[in-house]
Design a protein with these regions (language model features):
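Sec-dependent N-terminal signal peptides
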Residues: 4-15
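Gram-negative (and chloroplast) outer-membrane scaffold detector with strong preference
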Residues: 39-134, 179-182
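Short strand-turn segments of transmembrane beta-barrel domains in outer membranes
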Residues: 26-33
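Acidic, glycine-rich calcium-binding repeat modules characteristic of RTX/beta-roll
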Residues: 36
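Boundary at the C-terminal end of the N-terminal hydrophobic targeting segment
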Residues: 17-21
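N-terminal "first-domain core" detector
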Residues: 23-25, 44
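Predominantly the C-terminal beta-signal and adjacent terminal strand-loop region
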Residues: 127-184
């Protein structure tokens, strides 16, 4: 994590890429309330940055009441045309986090996770430097149990394990991504 912060600091504090002027836009911030990203524009088509967030899911199936995930990671954006125009984009994300599942009996199960997403989608860019991005694609979530706090012996931990195994790889992620961004 320390190395990630050092790399991002160097990118953010460095002068513009050769051939660019300081008046050109250099950063992109996007959000969808649960996920926030901050990226440094490398050139017309590429940006690199980090993402973080906290998501809540009301599951209410298979004895699992809800899930809460906290995560942090790095991302790279490539557009077929440009970052400051309407364009198709490819967005790989790599991150780490924790998910806490709460079952119907009040037990909690905490999982450490390593996430890899490869999103593809479309980015609409507006003249006021706002953008809207929609994407979806495959995901891989490698999760391992860190702890459990049992409130009963009903065996709900097996239901949580089954859910974690089902989400290990999804050809199309169960949640499409919709972001609103600002370039500055």
């Amino acid at each position: 994590m320390k190395h990630l912060l050092i790399i991002l600091s160097v990118l953010l504090l460095s002068s513009p890429v050769i051939g660019e002027t300081s008046e050109e836009k250099q950063f992109i911030a996007t959000t969808n309330i649960f996920v926030n990203t901050f990226s440094y524009i490398l050139n017309k088509q590429n940006a690199v940055g980090f993402h973080f967030g906290k998501g809540f899911t009301d599951i209410n199936e298979d004895n699992i009441e809800k899930g809460e995930t906290i995560f942090l990671g790095v991302n790279y954006t490539y557009t077929l045309d440009c970052l400051q125009c309407d364009s198709i984009f490819i967005l790989p994300l790599f991150g780490r986090g924790n998910t806490v599942y709460t079952t119907n009996d009040g037990s909690t199960y905490t999982y450490s996770r390593l996430d890899i997403y490869l999103l593809g989608g479309y980015r609409w860019y507006f003249e006021n430097d706002l953008s809207v991005q929609f994407g979806m694609g495959p995901s891989s979530v490698n999760a391992s149990k860190k702890s459990e706090n049992l409130k009963s012996n009903k065996g709900y931990g097996n239901d949580v394990e089954d859910r974690v195994k089902k989400r290990r790889f999804e050809l199309i992620n169960h949640t499409p991504f919709l972001f609103i961004g600002y370039t500055f």
